[in-house]
Amino acid sequence: MGLIPKLLAGLVLLTLCVENGSGQYWSYGVRPGGKRNIEPLVDSFQEMAKEIDQLAEPQHFECTLHQPRSPLRDLKGALESLMEEETGQKKI
């Protein structure tokens, strides 16, 4: 086996070992053997549930800009009501 394939195989093995070894430290509350301490997890789930409940409450925003009624809006409403009356009369 040449020098380049040996170096490449060594680099691949080193990369895999470093990647697998560093993954254990990023886990939350992992003890040896893969066991977890449940108490901190329950607390964090309760905190997340409270945050979700707060986000689920509707927020009411008030518009501070006063916009006068548009005559086109009034005309549109009048035309819609006329069309509804005509279609209602034709159905009878």
Swiss-Prot record:
Provide the positions where the record notes the PTM Glycine amide: 33
Where does the record place the modification Pyrrolidone carboxylic acid?
A: 24
Q: Name one GO molecular function term.
A: gonadotropin-releasing hormone receptor binding
Matching entries from PROSITE patterns are given as: GNRH
Which range is the signal sequence, renumbered to this chain? Answer: 1-23
- Keyword Iron in the entry? The reply is no
Q: Which domain of life is it from?
A: Eukaryota
Q: Which GO terms describe its biological process?
A: negative regulation of neuron migration; regulation of gene expression; regulation of ovarian follicle development; response to ethanol; response to steroid hormone
Q: Which GO terms describe its cellular component?
A: extracellular space
- Site (Appears to be essential for biological activity) location in chain: 26
- Primary location: secreted
* Keywords annotated in UniProt: Amidation, Cleavage on pair of basic residues, Hormone, Pyrrolidone carboxylic acid, Secreted, Signal
**UniProt subcellular location:** Secreted
InterPro entries in the cross-refs: GnRH (IPR002012), Gonadoliberin (IPR019792), Gonadoliberin_I_precursor (IPR004079)
Membrane-spanning residues where? none
The protein's site described by Cleavage is found at: 26-31, 33-34
Family the UniProt entry places it in = Belongs to the GnRH family.
Role = Stimulates the secretion of gonadotropins; it stimulates the secretion of both luteinizing and follicle-stimulating hormones.
Could you identify this protein by its name? Progonadoliberin-1
**Provenance organism:** Cavia porcellus
